[in-house]
Swiss-Prot record:
Subcellular location: Secreted
GO cellular component: extracellular region
UniProt KW Secreted keyword: yes
A Pfam match: FSAP_sig_propep
UniProt name for this protein: Temporin-ALh
Amino acid sequence: MFPLKKSLLLLFFLATINLSLCEQERNAEEERRDEPDERNAEVEKRFLPIVGKLLSGLSGLSGK
């Protein structure tokens, strides 16, 4: 049970760092853009793959 908790904690930590870096990059891009429609499309494109990877990682860990 302990290795599973350790793996989940590591995954959560790495995902938090990844989301933080993406948010900083997104904020920098938002400052350069004027049209909100382009900004929303970019956020959706960036957010969905991250969520997919996170969910697949969690399902892989729970299957072991």
